[in-house]
Swiss-Prot record:
Entry PTM: Autophosphorylated in vitro.
Membrane topology value: Single-pass type I membrane protein
Name of the molecule in the record: PR5-like receptor kinase
Enzyme class: transferase
Glycosylation sites: N26, N88, N163, N233
Cystine crosslinks: C33-C249, C81-C91, C96-C103, C153-C238, C158-C221, C166-C184, C188-C197, C198-C208
Example of a GO biological process term: response to fungus
Family of this protein: In the N-terminal section; belongs to the thaumatin family.
UniProt-annotated binding residues for ATP: L337, G338, K339, G340, G341, F342, G343, T344, V345, K360
């Protein structure tokens, strides 16, 4: 009797064990990368453990890990790992800090692409997701393997190489190959702001909104978590106790398909007529959509044609040149002045007057050529001593060119570069700063239509024969009707290092002409820093990693002027330098409403130093960069003067400078 009861109880327990799905699983880990990957595991549940917490997978290898019931944890891939002469194991990305291949229950150091699992949770379901909240290092995909009948569970992953599209200031470069990034940081890790990290007053979902950076991640990997309060639907569920295949560097995106098949025979027959109905309706809708699209495209092409043939010339009110004449004036494009994202700039000469000109030939682009229209429409409305003059244009189908006055002394960055043996004197720097401010004030207030430049940087400030500064390159400019104060932006514009914080996140405020004010302030600070780079570099180890504007503010506040301006500065030069610092610090206030308009900037520059107040500290953080120990030779630093901080390329492929002498950004 007892034996029969024991057998029955055992049968019930075993039956429950299998029916409820509480059984061990197999995780098959595959490496399809062109290099070795070291998978790592972190177990969250104390009652269960894995047979290994880390191992090596060479190219093309795979390994099956038996995962116990109710396991909860995460896994990731480590890359570019090595063992030191003392036996310490470390990885450039995803390192868990254990000093060996096994991770010893320690997590991954960001930036790392993460997979989270909770097995046998609510109603016996598995929960799993992929996250780039802590940054990104490797593409991967999770594919559930169905057991028995039922619905096929969803694949999830991030199969795109985000390292290629990573914003330049978030890239982590390898120590051996400094041309190709090996990981992409998240904005919180890079900047440390509450807006990016979702803490403090931004610690609630309603307050912490997606930023430009998290949106970039989301667009590339829509099924992955991109920031702390991302859509909860990115957590996927699966029943029927499946096994899982995790693949690093999957071969194609087809592995991300999400089938949902019913395997019950009766259901197949019942749904066959529904399938035919759906196919028929879909075909009819597709045909209707195609017809509508064709009509829209043809209408748009007709409008574009009208614009191409008539409106450009009517708006610009400038001389229009044929492509043949453009080719002749540049001597068949013989003398290259500079190259950039929008095209190439050549030196030319007008046939009728013999005047030297700069000719920008725009790259062939899809659409209506927004950058061309921006530049022609903007500059045709300007006439100011501190704005480069537009002399004519060419518009022949996909051949587009803009003819400017020639600037023999190149761009401002040439004169404030750390490599220059002689620097501009303080009086000249002051004149340049005033000239730029007058040009911006003219664009913002005294044009028929307000123009916001959105790409103020030293490369876009050209110097004439008398070293008078002239604002150039209006490819990213925006014309504002009725001098509107708030501008609607679909995409961020500008060059990293000079872009106002409200361009990154609406948590800082609205985008407006004050965004140009911020860029202007950063340019002035760079002029000050380049003038005294020796002092900055010799400032001591305590300030070696401090962001330069913050360093200037703290020393200025303490009255330690000589550390900023040097010992040899005269009293008159010191007044100029102080004035430039105060104005620049006012211009880079984080809140746009705290920045002065350009007309006020001119008053501050031309007024008495004693009338200027010291602004609040404009910087809430120091954009220091966390680099793994194995990347100590990396070029990426947080120093203000490192070229990686003021990136020379623009987010929207902004044109480089039109300058004398061949130079590429």
């Amino acid at each position: 009797m007892v034996e029969g009861f024991s057998l029955s109880l055992m049968f019930l327990l075993v039956s429950h064990f299998f029916v409820s799905g509480v059984m061990s699983r197999n995780f098959t880990i595959e490496n399809k990368c062109d290099y070795t990957v070291w998978p790592g595991f972190l177990t969250m549940t104390t009652a269960v453990s894995l047979p290994t917490n880390g191992f090596s997978l060479k190219k093309g290898e795979s390994r099956v890990i038996n995962v116990p019931p109710s396991w909860s944890g995460r896994l990731w891939g480590r890359s570019f790992c090595s063992t030191s002469s003392t036996g310490n194991f470390s990885c450039a990305t995803g390192d868990c800090g254990s000093g060996k291949i096994e991770c010893s229950d320690s997590g991954a150091r960001p930036p790392t692409t993460l997979i989270d699992f909770t097995l046998d949770a609510t109603d016996g379901q598995d929960f799993y997701d992929v996250s780039v909240v802590d940054g990104y290092n490797l593409p991967l995909v999770v594919v559930p393997q169905r057991l028995g009948s039922g619905r096929t569970c969803s694949n999830v992953g991030c199969v795109v190489n985000l390292n290629k599209t990573c914003p330049s200031e978030l890239k982590v470069m390898g120590s051996s190959n400094k041309e190709h990034p090996i990981a992409c940081m998240n904005a919180c890790q890079k900047f440390g702001l509450p807006e990016f990290c979702c803490y403090g007053e931004y610690g609630k979902p309603a307050k912490c909104q997606p930023t430009l950076y998290s949106t970039n991640f989301k667009n590339e990997c829509p099924l992955a978590y991109s920031y702390a309060y991302d859509n909860e639907n990115n957590t996927f569920r699966c029943s029927n106790s499946p096994n899982y295949v995790i693949t690093f560097c999957p071969n194609d995106i087809s592995s991300m398909s999400q089938p949902s098949k019913e395997t019950n025979g009766g259901t197949k027959q019942k749904s066959s007529w529904k399938l035919k109905l759906i196919v028929g309706v879909s075909a009819a809708l597709t045909l209707m959509i195609l017809i509508v699209v064709v009509i829209i495209v043809r209408t748009k092409n007709m409008r574009n044609s009208e614009w191409n043939d008539q409106n450009v010339e009517a708006v610009a009110m400038l001389k229009r040149y044929s492509y043949t004449r453009v080719k002749k004036m540049t001597n068949s494009f013989a003398h290259v002045l500079g190259k950039g994202g929008f095209g190439t700039v050549y030196k030319g000469k007008l046939a009728d007057s013999g005047r030297d000109v700069a000719v920008k030939i725009l790259k062939v682009s899809e659409g209506n050529g927004e950058e061309f229209i921006n530049e022609v429409a903007s500059m045709s409305r300007t006439s100011h001593v501190n704005i480069v003059s537009l002399l004519g244009f060419c518009y022949e189908k996909n051949k587009r060119a803009i003819i400017y006055e020639f600037m023999p002394n190149g761009s401002l960055d040439k004169y404030i570069s750390a490599n220059m043996s002689t620097k501009m004197e303080w009086e000249r720097l002051y004149d340049v700063a005033v000239g730029i401010s007058r040009g911006l004030e003219y664009l913002h207030n005294r044009c028929v239509t307000r123009i916001v430049h959105f790409d103020i940087k030293p490369q876009n400030i050209l110097m004439d024969e008398n070293l008078c500064p002239k604002i150039s390159d209006f490819g990213l400019a925006k014309l504002c009707k009725n001098k509107e104060s708030i501008i609607s932006m679909l995409h961020m514009r500008g060059t990293f290092g000079y872009i106002a914080p409200e361009m990154f996140s609406k948590n800082f405020g609205a985008v407006s002409h004050k965004s140009d004010v911020y860029s202007y302030g950063m340019v002035v600070l760079e002029m000050i820093g380049a003038k005294n780079i020796e002092k900055v570099e010799y400032s001591g180890s305590n300030n070696g990693s401090m962001y330069f504007p913050e360093w200037v503010y703290k020393d200025f506040e303490k009255g330690e002027i000589t550390r900023i301006f040097g010992d040899s500065i005269t009293d008159e030069e010191e007044k100029i330098a102080k004035k430039l610092v105060l104005v620049a610090l006012w211009c880079i206030q984080m809140n746009p409403s705290d920045r002065p308009p350009m007309i006020k900037v001119i008053e501050m520059l031309e007024g008495n130093l004693e009338a200027l107040q010291v602004p609040p500290n404009p910087l809430l953080f120091s954009p220091e960069e966390t680099v793994p120990d194995t990347l100590e030779d990396s070029d990426d630093t947080s120093t203000f003067f490192n070229p990686s901080h003021f990136e020379r390329g623009t987010l929207l492929d902004s044109e480089d400078v039109l300058q004398h002498g061949s130079r590429s950004s």
